[in-house]
Curated annotation (Swiss-Prot):
Necessary cofactors: Mg(2+)
Function of the molecule: Serine/threonine-protein kinase that plays a key role in polarization of neurons and centrosome duplication. Phosphorylates CDC25B, CDC25C, MAPT/TAU, RIMS1, TUBG1, TUBG2 and WEE1. Following phosphorylation and activation by STK11/LKB1, acts as a key regulator of polarization of cortical neurons, probably by mediating phosphorylation of microtubule-associated proteins such as MAPT/TAU at 'Thr-504' and 'Ser-554'. Also regulates neuron polarization by mediating phosphorylation of WEE1 at 'Ser-642' in postmitotic neurons, leading to down-regulate WEE1 activity in polarized neurons.
UniProt feature, compositional bias: Low complexity: 430-457, 509-533
Organism of this sequence: Mus musculus (Mouse)
Organismal lineage: Eukaryota, Metazoa, Chordata, Craniata, Vertebrata
Omega-N-methylarginine PTM sites in chain numbering: 466, 481, 484, 498, 525, 550
Loss of function: phenotype: No visible phenotype. Mice are fertile and healthy. In contrast, mice lacking both Brsk1 and Brsk2 show little spontaneous movement and are only weakly responsive to tactile stimulation: they die within 2 hours of birth. Defects are due to impaired neuronal differentiation and polarity.
Effect of residue 63 to R: Abolishes kinase activity and ability to regulate centrosome duplication
Protein name: Serine/threonine-protein kinase BRSK1
Compositionally biased tracts (Gly residues): 1-12
Length: 778
């Protein structure tokens, strides 16, 4: 994540912003009150754009996430990042202001800092003085100490994720890999960047996230003082071996007391590695206490009273949604029990921290918005009705627009057609703790989920028991959510027919959660702008006629705005059993594999053809088998006399790091029917076509493997491409002549994202630890 010059999540959105000259104001793109301007960062998964408030002129960084181009597991990590950022309030952690969304994009409104990345600063200045390095290091440790006090582990610390403000103070960004480490449990997901990841993470072992962060801090401190990395190699396999051994050269110019600190932090044995408390007591760390820096003052702790909730008290739905996004509170019954217990526990701490955040920074409707001509403008995530600390409901803070809609339904002034539809849609949107987690579909192949938690004190005390159509009920507590951006009266469309919603039978509840079909806030009273035809008055009591018209309006709106998409990109090579349970709750291993995968789906069958001339069939088959055997980590089987099945994958490492490429090779005669083979298996010369068909796996790696096989078939000499493929598999990169072997200079632009990442800058933001397809971990 970034707000200065860093990459962001999401695909490239369709924003056409000014080139050299500004457009008239009516052509500007807005996210809420923020006008989008120049692009601050551009990565493989999205954009970060500068946003300027249309009234106050406040600058923010808007991270744009394209939901349709990312897998469901990655989107769930974005939601977890949002929830974690709401837990952290520290001067050296990047702030999250708000979250907006429409059907296609998710917009994270972040604090804007103008100093760029610490990585670029280090490249520009070279190694830093011990005084300046200590300043940065103490700020990083201060922020980490705050995060660890709330059991939050970053797990991807590196100079690229450390931003600088205008006063050169640190802001830790990109909590996409962060996790809550509950109690004494250990983490399992291997993540991070290979140059900064600790040995236990690389080995695929269970690890303490706090100790892993300490290793990364040691590597960062070494880079600040030396201008190079302690572990560096062009070959990824060799790099990982160096990290596991933990042997590095300590330059003589590093102060002796700092050398002892570095050795204590970059320690292979996690039990011997220095903890945060030990680091903060180290002489070199304390040596800068006399250096004045107001930003080094510890952040005031957030003290919240943790009380036990009464058995009949209501739990805040926004807070529960955020806790669900954190991924470690999946046992609903246990969470319910812990929140209502008399003793203090971590569940109550997280609950009251999020509730305190919601009370202090309520997310309400935007009051002053610029004119918008967008078909599907971004809408702000707003809070559900507020609950007190004792579970009592508070009056909801409603904007004038919401009041106008609810009052219009009871005889007030009419609402403009377009605005009424927008606000009616918005009232049904997922809500969160000032932008915390919303209800993502838990499966990329299924309809959206119901609320993760639906605690009701009594069986008859829910919304349906109170009456969804009660005249006094103008707000919703926790409705069963439909698709993002969809209305409450529409059913989630199946993947095969997304544009034709199927409304339920009139009068029947829409979901199994027991939520009424329609709420008082979501009765459309007018058709969208530009829709031919008018809306007839609803039937008395909302009978069959009203339901039919609502269904028709939903259908028109879907065809006008586009239906939500629930079929995410497929994860890497899921089996039939995995396809039936693609949720992190039921398949954590699959969720881990999906994070390392390149999220490439095969929309069509990919084939590569090779025509061979004047060569007998037996010779072609022998050459193919020889090519198979010459490629490391490639296995094959014979299907028939003219067909082979091959698989190229890493061997010897944890299964989470393997990305197999499976393909089939077929030989056919291009001169009529296939000639009959002789007794010795050979046939006469002719023209043969060799077809390589990708079955599963990354397309780019498939092409590289086929190119290597083709080189063998087209020549009788050993081809350097075989070794090139092996080097690529091991993570090697070709350096241009004159490139310094060890430095922190930024790598040149690469057109092949599947090639191993530069050791200087770490892998791309989304690739994390696995930089190449099929790279083995010894």
């Amino acid at each position: 994540m970034s707000s200065g010059s860093k990459e962001g999540g999401g695909g490239s959105p369709a924003y056409h912003l000014p080139h050299p000259h500004p457009h008239p104001p009516q052509h500007a793109q807005y996210v809420g009150p923020y006008r989008l301007e120049k692009t601050l960062g551009k990565g493989q998964t999205g954009l970060v754009k500068l946003g300027v408030h249309c009234i106050t002129g406040q600058k923010v960084a808007v991270k744009i996430v394209n939901r349709e181009k990312l897998s469901e597991s990655v989107l769930m990590k974005v939601e977890r990042e949002i929830a974690i950022l709401k837990l952290i309030e520290h001067p050296h952690v990047l702030k999250l202001h708000d979250v907006y969304e429409n059907k296609k994009y998710l917009y994270l409104v972040l604090e804007h800092v103008s100093g760029g990345e610490l990585f670029d600063y280090l490249v520009k200045k070279g190694r830093l003085t011990p005084k300046e390095a200590r300043k940065f290091f103490r700020q990083i440790v201060s922020a980490l100490d705050f995060c660890h006090s709330y059991s939050i582990c970053h797990r991807d610390l590196k100079p690229e994720n450390l931003l600088l403000d205008e006063k050169n103070n640190i802001r830790i960004a990109d909590f996409g890999m962060a996790s809550l480490q509950v109690g004494d449990s250990l983490l399992e997901t291997s993540c991070g960047s290979p140059h900064y990841a600790c040995p236990e993470v690389i080995k695929g072992e269970k690890y303490d996230g706090r100790r892993a962060d300490m290793w990364s801090c040691g590597v960062i401190l070494f880079a600040l003082l030396v201008g190079a990395l302690p572990f560096d190699d062009d070959n990824l396999r060799q790099l990982l071996e160096k990290v596991k051994r933990g042997v590095f050269h300590m330059p003589h110019f590093i102060p002796p007391d700092c050398q002892s600190l570095l050795r204590g932090m970059i320690e292979v044995e996690p039990e011997k590695r220095l903890s945060l408390e030990q680091i903060q007591k180290h002489p070199w760390y304390l040596g800068g206490k006399h250096e004045p820096d107001p930003c080094l003052e510890p952040a005031p702790g957030r003290r919240v009273a943790m009380r036990s909730l009464p058995s009949n008290g209501e739990l805040d739905p926004d807070v529960l949604e955020s806790m669900a996004s954190l991924g470690c509170f999946r046992d609903r019954e246990r969470l319910h029990r812990e929140l209502r217990s008399e003793e203090e526990n971590q569940e109550k701490m997280i609950y009251y921290l999020l509730l305190d955040r919601k009370e202090r920074y309520p997310s309400c409707e935007d009051q002053d918005l610029p004119p918008r001509n967008d078909v599907d403008p971004p809408r702000k995530r707003v809070d559900s009705p507020m609950l007190s600390r004792h579970g009592k409901r508070r009056p909801e803070r409603k904007s004038m627009e919401v009041l106008s809609i609810t009052d219009a339904g009871s005889g007030g002034s009419p609402v403009p057609t377009r605005r009424a539809l927008e606000m009616a849609q918005h009232s049904q949107r997922s809500r969160s703790v000032s932008g915390a987690s919303t209800g993502l579909s838990s499966s990329p192949l299924s309809s959206p989920r119901s609320p993760v938690f639906s605690f009701s004190p009594e069986p008859g005390a829910g919304d349906e028991a109170r009456g969804g159509g009660s005249p006094t009920s103008k707000t919703q507590t926790l409705p069963s959510r439909g698709p993002r951006g969809g209305g409450a009266g529409e059913q989630p469309p199946p993947p095969s027919a997304r544009s034709t919603p199927l409304p339920g039978p009139p009068g029947s509840p829409r979901s199994s959660g027991g939520t009424p079909l329609h709420s008082p806030l979501h009765t459309p009273r007018a058709s969208p702008t530009g829709t031919p035809g008018t809306t007839p008055p609803p039937s008395p009591g909302g009978g069959v006629g009203g339901a039919a018209w609502r269904s028709r309006l939903n259908s028109i709106r879907n065809s006008f705005l586009g239906s939500p998409r629930f079929h995410r990109r497929k994860m890497q090579v899921p089996t039939a059993e995995e396809m039936s349970s693609l949720t992190p709750e039921s398949s954590p291993e699959l969720a881990k594999r999906s994070w390392f995968g390149n999220f490439i789906s095969l929309d069509k069958e990919e084939q590569i053809f090779l025509v061979l001339k004047d060569k007998p069939l037996s010779s072609i088959k022998a050459d193919i088998v020889h090519a198979f055997l010459s490629i490391p980590s490639l296995s094959h089987s014979v299907l028939s006399q003219t067909s082979f099945r091959a698989e190229y994958k890493a061997s010897g490492g944890p299964s989470v790091f393997q990305k197999p490429v499976r393909f089939q090779v077929d030989i056919s005669s291009s001169e009529g029917p296939e000639p009959s083979p002789r007794r010795d298996g050979s046939s006469g010369g002719g023209i043969y076509s060799v077809t390589f068909t990708l079955i599963s796996g990354p397309s780019r790696r498939f092409k590289r493997v086929v190119e290597t096989i083709q080189a063998q078939l087209l020549s009788t000499h050993d081809q350097p491409s075989v070794q090139a493929l092996a080097d690529e598999k091991n993570g090697a990169q070709t350096r241009p002549a004159g490139t310094p072997p060890r430095s922190l200079q930024p790598p040149p632009g690469r057109s092949d994202p599947d090639l191993s990442s530069s050791p200087r800058r770490g892998p791309p933001k989304d690739k994390k630890l696995l930089a190449t397809n099929g790279t083995p971990l010894p």
